From Swiss-Prot:
Name recorded for this polypeptide: NADH-quinone oxidoreductase subunit D
GO cellular component term, pick one: plasma membrane
Keyword field contains Repeat: no
Organism: Janthinobacterium sp. (strain Marseille)
Domain of life from the UniProt record: Bacteria
Designated gene of the protein: nuoD
Lineage per the UniProt record: Bacteria, Pseudomonadati, Pseudomonadota, Betaproteobacteria, Burkholderiales
Coiled coil regions in record: none
Length: 417
């Protein structure tokens, strides 16, 4: 009898579990994966090239659109690289605000990951709960920047503006009656810090709810335990970072190992896995949400007691105040020049990396002394993770490929750039 050849299957890019535009060419022996070949580039938008034609400030909104689930963390690495080259000091209050919003972004990302991952595996309920909490955090974004997703809130030298004293209120509509609106607005009567503090008090209970639904769930464990195992040595060799590396038992977190902003003043722990499988990575990310909540609490407490500027006083970089612009012609000219021509950055190069929710997100900038970068290179955390997909999926079933894609927490905006 003739030998049966392996079967080739196209997975995605229209597949609901492909998380955007992933195309996988799977080589199968029956239902067992022999090879997984990811095809990328379907969401390529030439961000690195576009940044060469725009001033440093005009490229900030492009950063939001890279990993469009962790918006402010992308901006953070970019503005840190600019600040390194300009050698400017960021006010302490702005550093605390950045750290607080980095952690809000981390929770936003992990909630999206948890909901989507559980949905891919077949658990519908967690998805709905996770999005309930995401709404509150999106409102924090909206309060400081006016946008629920693409905030462009971090600026070279600080942040766009200080935290507001009021929260946006829900208005009565056709789909919600007055009673529902008053319930929604109940915790929005104070400042943004009051709202965030209220959220941090409620959030640990929500995380317990997710764990009740999943952690000891027999089906969840059958789908995740022992799937996509990566040894610590292989994880480091393949360039894994973030939860993908910590899930394999390597204690590496830039917030502790190479502290930036005020992370060295924060009290938090790094969760680390032992087996390097999908289940350990799930546990690591769930614990990360609890640790992020701890950091946010510390930031809220400090910000309540310490006022101060949120933008550097270096006026080559910082725009004039809105009040000054309305009364002073020089301020108006300064504002116009800053946002049209931009500031010139000294010749040199800088690399800045942050502990992004998905791993190490780095921005490498080269300046030739002009008002726009000569070259920008983005180090996307998801890129090496996707590269390791072939090794992680080998020998598993087709259904497990969905679990492995889910555990990698892949977003194509940053991979294709």
């Amino acid at each position: 009898m003739a030998e049966i050849k392996n079967y080739t299957l196209n997975f995605g890019p229209q597949h609901p579990a492909a998380h955007g535009v992933l195309r996988l060419v799977l080589e199968l022996d029956g239902e067992v994966i022999q090879r997984a070949d990811p095809h990328i580039g379907l969401l390529h938008r030439a961000t690195e090239k576009l940044a060469e034609q725009k001033t440093y400030l005009q490229s900030v909104p492009y950063m939001d659109r890279l990993d469009y689930v962790s918006m402010m963390c992308n901006e953070h690495a970019y503005v840190m690289a600019i600040e390194k080259m300009l050698n400017i000091e960021v006010p302490l209050r702005a550093q605390y605000i950045r750290v607080m919003f980095d952690e809000i972004t981390r929770i936003l990302n992990h909630l999206m990951w948890l909901g989507a991952h559980a949905l891919d595996v077949g658990a519908m309920g967690v998805f709905l709960y996770a999005f309930r909490e995401r709404e509150d955090l999106m409102d924090c974004y909206e309060a400081v920047s006016g946008a629920r997703m693409h905030a462009a809130y971090y600026r070279p030298g600080g942040v766009y503006r200080d935290l507001p004293d009021t929260m946006p209120q829900h208005k009565a509509s056709i789909i919600r009656n007055a009673k529902a609106i008053s319930q929604l607005n109940e915790n929005r009567q104070g400042s943004l810090l009051d709202f965030i503090e209220d959220f941090t008090n409620r959030f640990p209970t929500y995380v317990d709810e997710y764990e009740t639904l999943l952690t000891d769930n027999r089906i969840w464990k059958q789908r995740l335990v022992g799937i996509g195992v990566v040894s610590p040595e292989r994880a480091m060799a393949m360039g894994f970072t973030g939860a993908m590396l910590r899930g394999s038992g390597v204690e590496w977190d830039l917030r502790k190992k190479q502290p930036y902003e005020v992370y060295d003043l924060m009290d938090f722990d790094i969760p680390v896995g032992t087996n390097g499988d999908c289940y350990d990575r799930y546990l690591v990310r769930v614990e990360e949400m609890r640790q992020s909540n701890r950091i946010i609490k510390q930031c809220v407490e400090w910000l309540r007691n310490n006022a101060g500027p949120v933008m550097t006083d270096n006026h080559k970089v910082a725009p004039p105040s809105r009040v000054g612009m309305k009364s002073n012609m020089e301020d108006l000219i300064h504002h116009f020049k800053l946002f049209t021509e931009g500031f010139h950055v000294p010749t040199g190069e800088a690399y800045a990396a942050v502990e992004h929710p998905k791993g190490e997100f780095g921005v490498y900038l080269i300046s030739d002394g002009a008002n726009k970068p000569y070259r920008m290179k983005i180090r996307a955390p998801g890129f090496p993770h996707l590269q390791g997909l072939d090794e992680m999926a080998k020998g598993h079933m087709i259904a497990d490929a969905v679990t492995i894609i889910g555990t990698q927490d892949i977003v194509f905006g940053e991979i294709d750039r």
